[in-house]
Amino acid sequence: MRPTMKAVGHYQYLPIEHPESLLDVQVDAPQPEGRDLLVEVKAISVNPVDTKRRAAGNRPDTELKILGWDAAGIVQATGPEAELFKPGDKVYYAGSNQRPGTNCQLHLVDERIVGPKPANLSFAEAAALPLTTLTAWEAQFERMGISKSGAHAGRRLLILGGAGGVGSIAIQLAKKLGRLAVIASASRPDSIACRSHTRSAWSEMCSIS
């Protein structure tokens, strides 16, 4: 008999108030192949894309959908071609939308999109980083072409929604790697967090909207 695991998923795209919009289920545990890592999930985070995918339509389905991108956990087993990690390694990552999500006890992920969990972060803290950090990184350094070596040091960068997940990471990347002067906006309840991210030797500010 194959081992099983607990997961959270849905069969139908129902309003979140519906009792079957998200279900606790017992499913077969996955088996690693190729360069897969089988990760015992210790923490996950929820992103806006999770709500969008769960609300993708009204059609009933017979296939279980497991949500979740971000995860942090411990490698339990590896596929035969895996070479970057070994059982016992602590890792974090944003998974793939081509595979079941991370809202489960055991999750398969290609080792090439996985990183070692920072030793100074808890599993919960590490799980909060991947998707927001990737989004902020790609926006600044790949789309906008901001230098990671400080070639644009001292220039001003406006970040809207500076207290949010992506915004708070974007501020820190802009300051640490880009050495930019950051101007960020935030709603009044979030202004304290935003100010803590923008504070530095520069005369930076956080506008309150």
What are these language model-derived features?
Residues 113-123, 152-154:
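Glycine/charged-rich beta-loop-alpha catalytic/anionic-binding loops adjacent to active sites
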Residues 129-204:
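Mid-domain Rossmann-like dinucleotide-binding core that forms the NAD(H)/NADP(H) cofactor-binding site
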Residues 124-128:
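C-terminal boundary of histidine-terminating zinc-finger modules
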Residues 28-45, 55-98:
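Glycine-rich beta-strand-centered segment in the early N-terminal region that forms part
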Residues 98-111:
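A structural motif shared across PLP-dependent enzymes of the aminotransferase-like
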Residues 1-5:
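Eukaryotic N-terminal low-complexity, Ser/Thr- and Lys/Arg-rich leader segments
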